[in-house]
Amino acid sequence: MVNITVLHNELENFIEEKSGFSVLIKSDNVKILFDVSYSDDIIQNSKKGNIDLSNIDYLVFSHGHIDHTEGLKFINLSDIKNVLAHPDCFQKKYFRLFFLFFKPETATAIFTKFC
């Protein structure tokens, strides 16, 4: 059985750093965290819902925009076993007037742990 829990799904408040997306996908023997949103909202929502974000088998990034990745700085990296992302996920992104990319400290944390 597969259980999918939406941890954060906010599309309207990008300017206020509240936008983003994150889901937790669990089966009997695998836990996948898909995207980590922008802020600590996934941590707050997981606490409210009594959802355990430890022992993540796979962290999957859909793409490298900060509204899907920046919440990583609130995640305990020792709880993540593997990261799956397209290599271009870590390259700078442009969208209109916003400069969207992994902030240097987030990218450093990922590369230090997994590369």
Where are the regions that the model predicts?
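Conserved beta-strand hairpin/beta-sheet module of binuclear metal-dependent hydrolase folds
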Residues: 2-49
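Residue-level marker for well-ordered alpha-helical positions
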Residues: 19, 40, 69, 104-105
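Short, glycine/charged-enriched secondary-structure capping and boundary segments
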Residues: 19-21, 48-49, 74-76, 98-100
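Short amphipathic alpha-helical segments and helix-helix/interface helices
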Residues: 22, 72-73, 108, 112
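Short, well-ordered coil/turn elements that cap or connect secondary structure elements
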Residues: 27, 77-78, 112
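Active-site metal-binding motif and surrounding structural segment of the metallo-beta-lactamase
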Residues: 41-89
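Metallo-beta-lactamase
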Residues: 89-115
